[in-house]
Each structure stands twice: as C-alpha cells, then as structure tokens.
Amino acid sequence: MKESILYEKLKKGLVKCKTCSHFCVIAPEKRGICGVRENIEGKLFFLPYGQAIAANIDPIEKKPLYHFLPKTFTFSIATVGCNFRCGNCQNWTISQFSKFPDTTRKMIEKSGENLSPKKIIELAQKNNCPSISYTYTEPTIFLEYAFDTMKLAKKAG
C-alpha cells in the first residue's frame, strides 16, 4: 500500500482522486471506481502497490505498437483494478477482481506476487527485455507503481 500522488483532500474526510478522468470523490473507508484506491482516515492510498497480479515476458509484437524494438521481448506487468468496465475484457478476472463485493482491503494488498520496482528491473534485465510494458489492465490505475518502476528503469538504461 502506498499513498496516492494525485488526489485532493476535501471537507468531512472526503478525498478527490485525480488519477483518472472519473475524479472519484471517495468517503472514508470507501474505494473509487477502480476498486484499488481507498480513503483511509482522509488520505488516499493505492492498495496493491508492489503486488504484480501479472508479470510475463511477451513478444513486443503483442503490444499495440508499430515497429517498436521489433523482434524483442518486453517485461509486462499489471496489478488488480481498472477504471473501465469493458464488456469483452479478456483480463476481467484481474481487472475487476477488486470490485467483487466480498473483496477485502487485505485481499487487494496481497493479490499477486510481491514484486518491487527494483525486482522488476532485475527480472527485465535478466530476461533480456529492453522494455517494460504496463498492461493487461488500465495502467493509469497503478500510476505510483509504474512511475517508481519507470524512474529505476531509466537509471538502469
């Protein structure tokens, strides 16, 4: 769990999430539309920080990019949660998991594999992946996790 970087504190313990275009106003002990940002005592937290629900090595051609590092592999990661509700989502079991009625904060915090940004860089390098893809769910939702990973990836080259 990590405090969100894009939110505003409002009156009466409410917070306004500014991570995506839904701009959820979230009451204490409630979550936004993504299901992974929760108001805890007047602060907004991203619950599954450091918990990759998916971590795979994919051919870059699988991604919606044109002629980007052709014939290479990318290290792909995602967390649970999504601000979309696409009717034919192929990853609905991970994107919508946090919205199931009986999903608790602890379940979200412990979902997936404990994978720090540093470990992601190490695994990408070990597997000769010159890129990291933030994918499978809407990556804006895991902004803090992705951003911390990006900063380390840039330093690592």
Question: In which residue ranges do the predicted regions lie?
Answer:
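Local cysteine-cluster metal-coordination motifs and their immediate loop/turn environment
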Residues: V15-R37, V80-W92
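Iron-sulfur (Fe-S) cluster-binding modules
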Residues: M1-T19
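Conserved Radical SAM active-site core
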Residues: N39-G157
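Short clusters of hydrophobic/aromatic residues that line enzyme substrate/ligand-binding pockets
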Residues: Y7, C34, F45
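Short secondary-structure capping/turn segments at boundaries of alpha-helices and beta-strands
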Residues: L6, S21-F23, K62-L65
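Short, ordered beta-strand-loop transition motifs
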Residues: K9-K12, P28, P70
